A protein has these predicted regions:
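FIC/Doc superfamily catalytic core
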Residues: 1-360
Length: 360
């Protein structure tokens, strides 16, 4: 099998077919509703943390990096001695996602240098774009080679330069931004510019592109859960574009993913909001030390600790410990020991987030 010859963008095929145009309104309506619902959560870091961690877990699972919710949230406590290798990789993902969001928020662009910076955080190395031949995509069950991406370093660089222009130049292809997102994702996956972490980097690019296009304000629309549930269709659709130019099927698959995921995320955010309101009423009615900052802390960190409360509330360590211990005694939180320290679980939020990922 020889490396597949990738063409430059824009795509020289009809990507706005009747079926695609018919599918667009539902995807856009769901996205618009999600954008509005997300804005009703008072502290944006709550959604970025809780949904971002879930996305990090799901996106890594596609690459067979498996971690439990318990390991994931423990790793967020920043106790390195207790982090599994898998949990560290998932934490790298959330760090890369946050960095990407920060970079595009500052510049309004998504450049190759930013993509390289995201990849560096993801993989914890500075390998950059591939310079050595030998990368092949294989069937995990049979070991057969199913796709060989470009091998020449200059070709990879040229294709990534073209992709950078396509992402940041609206006039290069006059089509709906959701169609462009599907094309960008296909192109990046096909270039496969890195030695490792291409899938995770590509899914971060999806999220950031939606924000660049002002279809979302926050990184909360995550397609990884949809891809996990439709993994074989996802890989088959990518390959069918390469082999048969079946762009319509690929774009429809991605549009359906946007619509379904947006609807699921709206439901999840609504449940988080309801739970926050329940906690707010209980805390405010029962404890003199209630504050919005404390409530935000308990939802920003499904597993919180004294140091987090000290930082978020600006109180002493003794005061923070007292707050958390009182809440644990009253079963608002569950206190657990880890090494020489303690952490505190918002069990209802934990159950909500972990059940979501188990849905068929």
């Amino acid at each position: 099998m020889r490396p597949w010859k990738i063409g430059n963008l824009p795509v020289d095929f009809d990507v706005e077919t009747k079926k695609v145009l018919k599918a667009l309104p539902a995807a856009h309506a769901a996205l618009a509703e999600l954008k509005g619902v997300a804005s009703t959560i008072p502290n944006q870091s709550i959604l970025i943390n809780t949904l971002g961690l879930q996305e990090a877990k799901d996106s890594s699972a596609i690459e067979n990096i498996i971690t439990t919710h318990d390991d994931l949230y423990k790793s967020g406590l920043n106790l390195n001695a207790f982090k599994s290798l898998e949990a560290k990789e998932v934490q790298n993902y959330i760090s890369a996602l946050k960095k990407g969001f920060e970079l595009i928020s500052e510049s309004g662009l998504l450049t190759n240098n930013m993509i390289l910076e995201i990849q560096e955080i993801l993989e914890n190395n500075k390998a950059g774009f591939r310079k050595l031949p030998g990368t092949e995509l294989k069937n995990s069950a049979t070991g057969d080679t199913i796709y060989i991406p470009p091998q020449d370093p200059q070709e990879i660089m040229d294709l990534m330069t073209n992709l950078e222009q396509y992402i940041n130049t609206p006039g290069m292809q006059d089509c709906d931004p959701l169609i462009k997102m599907a094309i960008i994702h296909f192109q990046f996956e096909s270039i496969h510019p890195f030695y490792d972490g291409n899938g995770r980097a590509g899914r971060i690019i999806n999220i950031l592109y939606l924000i660049l296009q002002k279809l979302q304000n926050l990184p909360v629309l995550y397609l990884s859960n949809y891809i996990i549930k439709n993994k074989q269709v996802y890989y088959n659709s990518l390959q069918q574009v390469r082999e048969e130019n079946l762009w319509e099927e690929w774009i429809l698959f991605m549009l359906k993913g946007v619509e379904i995921t947006a609807r699921e995320t709206i439901e999840l955010i609504s449940k988080i909001k309801e739970l926050m309101l329940y906690y707010k009423h209980r805390l405010r009615a029962t404890y003199k030390f209630y504050s919005q900052d404390l409530l935000n802390n308990l939802f920003k960190h499904p597993y919180t600790k004294i140091e987090f409360v000290v930082k978020d509330l600006g109180v002493s360590r003794l005061t923070a410990a007292n707050y958390l211990n009182v809440l644990a005694e009253d079963n608002m939180l569950r206190k657990e020991k880890l090494g020489t320290g303690n952490y505190y679980i918002n069990t209802e939020l934990f159950d909500l987030l972990s059940k979501r990922s188990k849905q068929p």
